[in-house]
Amino acid sequence: MKKYTFSFLLFVMSMLLVQAEQLHINPKTGNDNNSGTRAQPLKTVMEAARRVNLNKEPEATTIFLSEGIHLLTQTVVFNNDKYTLKNRLVIRADVMPDDAEWTPQKMPVVVTVAPLEPGVGGEEAKGIQPEVSHVTIKGLRFTGSPDYSYMDGTNLRRSYPIWRDGKNLDDLLITQCLFTGNADVLPLHVGVIANGYGLVIDHCVFFNCKIPVVFWKNNGETGSRSAMRYSLVYGGYFCGVWTTQGTDGDNFDFHHNIIASTSTVWIREKGSKNRYKASDCIFTDYNKLAGYGSGPLSDSDATATDFLEMKNVQTTGTIKIEKDQSKRNYLQLADGSIGSNLMAGLFKH
């Protein structure tokens, strides 16, 4: 009798362990009429989002993206706000940067070609829009959009690969992702822009992006800590990080980051009096260390740096980037570059 009882308990436990939604996407072999298993993958992220939004079961969700080019022909909105700190919505690569078999070619490439919509100061296209709390996005490569950014003297076309609008939302972790742009042909206006709380940028690389990340507005209540850590910003043609009056310096961590060959290192929302701390970082080859900004069309007005308490921050030296596409560290720090001790970049181990 004990044997059968034990077997039954094992069966129940195994059923509980698999109570999680998993969907696989392969842009080459997938079909949006498939079941979404690894053997029968979906074709588009849009279809995965549709299914996730319909599933009201209180369970975690993991969406696996295979290598290849994933075109977002419309904004992908996740609005099924059922997740918890433990049971998360995870959007991830099949193979992660720390896996032995990983190479840069294994990264799923997410390209936003969604129709532009009217926005403040021009038109904007949004890629992945998680309007839920407790989300992780990891191991993906995002590119700029093939838009002609200039409209006229007062308007721009802008792309946002990751956008979160809800000012009450919390806990958005972006980790081991690569954001690549080009000011002339594939402009990437902001890699990650998020209202709410708990935006964490971890082990990410931003290469030739106008603005890597904007820690945006919230509803004035309390939430989990926001952070930018172990990340590499190179060639930011506006700034390295943007904080607003809603970005509470006492609830914000900034450490082990490299910001190089960038116009302005740190932009604050115009009028902000918030103070911040930066530790164990390198800021080098910049035009201005700090400035104020007021919107997508504004230039930055240089400001004093007394708002920023810097501990063990290096401001000299040359950052070298690996440009050989055959190398595992492509678009990351080249071997022998200063800053290698900071572990900034895609690899955690």
Question: Where do the model's predicted regions map?
Answer:
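Short, T/G/N/S-enriched strand-turn elements that build extracellular solenoid repeat scaffolds
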Residues: M46-K56, L71-K82, G127, R268-G271
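All-beta strand scaffolds that present successive hydrophobic residues in beta-strands
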Residues: L65, I91, T136-I137, L169-I174, ...
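Acidic Gly/Asp/Thr-rich repetitive segments characteristic of extracellular carbohydrate-active
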Residues: P27-S66, A334-H349
